[in-house]
Amino acid sequence: MTITRRGFLSASAVLAAMPVLRASAAPLPREADIAVIGAGAAGIAAARRIMATGRKVIVVEAAPQIGGRCITDSTTFDTPFDRGARWMHNPDTNPMIRLARSAGLDVLPAPSGQKMRIGRRNARAGETEQFLAALVRANRAIDEAARAKLDSSCASVLPKDLGDWAGAAEFMLGAGFAGKDLKELSAIDKGRAQDRNAAIACRQGLGTLITKLGEQAPMALSTPASRIAWSNRDVSVETQAGKIAARAVIVTVSTNVLISGAIKFTPDIPKRTLDAASKLGLGSYDRIMLQLPGNPLGLSRDDILIEQSNSTRTALMFANIGGSSLCSIDVGGAFGRDLSEQGEKAMASFAREWIAKLFGSEAASAVQKTSATRWNASPFVMGAMSAASPGGQLSRRVLAEPIGNVFFAGEATHETLWGTVDGAWESGERAADAALRKIGALKDDPADVPTQSTKKRRAPRQ
């Protein structure tokens, strides 16, 4: 049976309304039409797309839970928090918003803007304006380099006269945006990233949403794929639980996992693909979670705070999450990577030190329970979001190219929504469509339906 895209979209609507079933712990199936490696946003999107056509799919996930880099922690503190991806974007076109509501979850606008701390005081209005002006100038310089197709580092094209605001601007555009310092980030990649100002939050957690959306999919958790044998006709996926024969496979693992060799390919995948993945290495971005009862910092619900800094040893705070006493200190880039390597104790010490610097030792002493993510040490992810190195922006398109009956998905394959769960989701749907076409299960209607990234183009900054 071949289904048209229009018929598929109707089936997708039915699938979204189906009762949610928990991922099966049944024995691993020995065959499927399409196997999906990874149960993050891209893998779940691909699986749902395939299920809507009535084709047989199996999702193979190395970790013991659904989510990938979207994990909501509901047990460490009284308040749930996202250990990884936190926001969605593009509310007018993002299908995940509708799916969240259909799943009974609450979506709401994320906090906009941030407060600036200068030493132990809040920035004055004029100082905030100066910072925003510096940020706009820095961003504009990167955009101009991108439009001129100068794929050098973002740092190399920055204005030289940002003064006291250079450190904060570089943090917000580099480590705080992509998990990499600007000297390690491609100007074209940064310039092509769609604006992400209209952020949307899921009150129950983005990880909770991905888990709910994946509960219908046939799932093998705690089952790392060790080898993929592929050709132009079929594939086989080897795991510790057995081998799966399929007509196609969609690989959604992170670029760092792909180049690590954790999954062997027979025959080897082309050097061109691995080179592309290596130029899209994951940045470092972690959260240090602190319980601060009594609001000793005097901040409001969901306040976002940064500091005027002349050093990369800095952070971003997301305070009083959801009106609770839980605060997140986010660190990234080279400093964040080095700090994470030192372990959770060192990360908590830095968070207390940072709070003491900005609010005083009494505020820092109010910290009670702490916890920290260490995504670089996660064996099934090995980092945060992909970020192209200088000269590497074209690698996203290369990485998305199918190889025989092997298809790749994940945020790293999206040219404008990279580093976002939205980009991961859309890439999974695209890869599923391509795989379904390859096996003859999907035929496009003459008038194709645009995706969220083609419905609304990014307007150039003025």
Outline where the language-model segments fall.
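Secretory targeting signals
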Residues: 1-3
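FAD-dinucleotide binding site
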Residues: 5-462
